[in-house]
Amino acid sequence: MPFKSLKELDPSEGTVQLYSGNISQQHLGDGDTVLFPQPSADPNDPLRWSKWRKHAVFLSICLFACLNNLNGTVLTDSFLTISEQLDVSVTEASGLLSWVVLIQGLANFIWVPTAIYFGKRPVFLLACAIDFIGAIWAAASPDFGSLLAASIFGGFGGGASEALGAAIINDIYFLHERGSKMSWYIISIAWGSSLGPLVGGYLIEYKGWQWGKWLGSILLGVNLLLIFFFAPETRFQRSPNPSVGSDPSLSSDSPSEKLGSRSEHLELGSNSPSSGRPSAAYPHKSYLQSLNPWSGIAPGASFWDLMFRPIPLLAYPACAFAALAYSLALAPTIMVNALSSTILIPPPYYFSIGSVGLINIAGMIGQGIGAFIGGFCIDKWSSFCARRNNGVFVPETRLLLFILPTIIVFAGILLFGFAVQLEMHWAIIFLAYGMLSVGLTGSASITMVYVCDCYFPVAAECLEMINGIKNVVAFALGYAVVPWVDNMGYIRAFGTLSGIFGGLMALVIPLLLWGPQIRHHTSSKWRLVSWELE
């Protein structure tokens, strides 16, 4: 099986001229922001779509991510009720969450290569339809076996909502927009997980657990219609890196020549393959034509090669760190979700089933703060740093703000352990959960955008690995958390987690210090991208 280096696919190695007065490049409006990637001359290029069309696609995929997680977590606070009504143990009932999380992660390894090969639109339509049917099946289930099978079936479809949604952001938005858009997407995933228990707790308390799934089916059905009418195909065959052209300054063997804090001004060549205006040589697709689910298979691609391609990419340091960071950011929220009812329902708190879900309000506030840091702030910070660097964007500038959510989460994990074991006021527990929830959006968004910046040609495959690993970790924690806390107590268990979290998150320091050199070496020397053509 032939392998290529990243540099053969993207000579920029992630470093691009983001601000320039060079008239041979396409810019944002009349300003000096260089569009990366450069749009092609084809009017059907997703980068050329109108704002409303891009935002309609973006809203549709964000809703799918949110509603899939809402449907998957809506029964979280009713495991005790389900165990009593369907004659199973609470541990078995918790499989309605843990098994679904695992299947969603593993489904990435099927959905992503399928979408690259057959197109993202047919995959999203099929995946949302499976999720929708699974919710109806679950709501009508007469016994636990049927309910679990339906949840797993729907979870398989819902797995497409994570890595593929992030890949679509890469398809339709430019580099200077990615941070904010990725943060909105991540917060859609996180808020779905928080809204499920929050809404489901009260709904199930008064209407029964079946209505939790009926609600999910109704919302997913509406979302399926939105995807059909407003999410056309975003897959597009473009030059490996048309914004860089053949400029030797961006492919220098010495990264210090182009990445210094005051590097020389870079001028991209005038031989850019893109033109500033759409070409009449390409027929423009009508709206009705865009509704066609089928756009053909990827020219020259091998499906089995696409299935295998993501695995070696985990060796790239940025990809490995992003998978680790997302998993660690998710870990404390998984633990709290698994333990919240056992903490808040017994004395001294005496919360009802419905009221337990209120802890997710604190989580949503924390996730909102994390999204602000990981979206708006990193875009503004990256822009500021690029302008100070003579217009040159360096992906590692995003990682400096990674430190802020890391500190907040570290403190939140410690506070939660002490607050529960010492039976502090419930408001302290809520505050701690809000703090540790900051990382679920802040840390995840920053690292996923960093991966897209570094490995643009294989971003979808990298995101596939990141999301798959993250969900496997979540599955393991779902089973391990209760015995872990029982054996060690809350202070020691969450103290251990905070130590693991802080120690492994510190691995961002080598990327901050030597990231450009690491990228240059690995992209030019490591041939890890399998590239077999049929």
What are these regions (language model features)?
Residues 69, 98-101, 105, 112, ...:
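C-terminal transmembrane bundle
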Residues 151-189:
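Cytoplasmic helix-loop-helix junction between adjacent transmembrane helices
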Residues 143-151, 163, 212-213, 322, ...:
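Short hydrophobic/alpha-helical segments at membrane-entry points of transmembrane helices
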Residues 71, 86-87, 110, 118-119, ...:
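Helix-breaking motifs and short loop linkers at transmembrane-helix boundaries and internal kinks
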Residues 1-68, 72, 90, 210-211, ...:
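Intracellular terminal tails of multi-pass secondary transporters
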Residues 53-90, 106, 111, 161, ...:
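Extracytoplasmic
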Residues 177-205, 211-223, 227, 363-371, ...:
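Glycine-rich segments within core transmembrane alpha-helices of 12-TM secondary carriers
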Residues 54-72, 152, 315-333, 434-435:
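Pair of pore-lining "gating" transmembrane helices in MFS-fold secondary transporters
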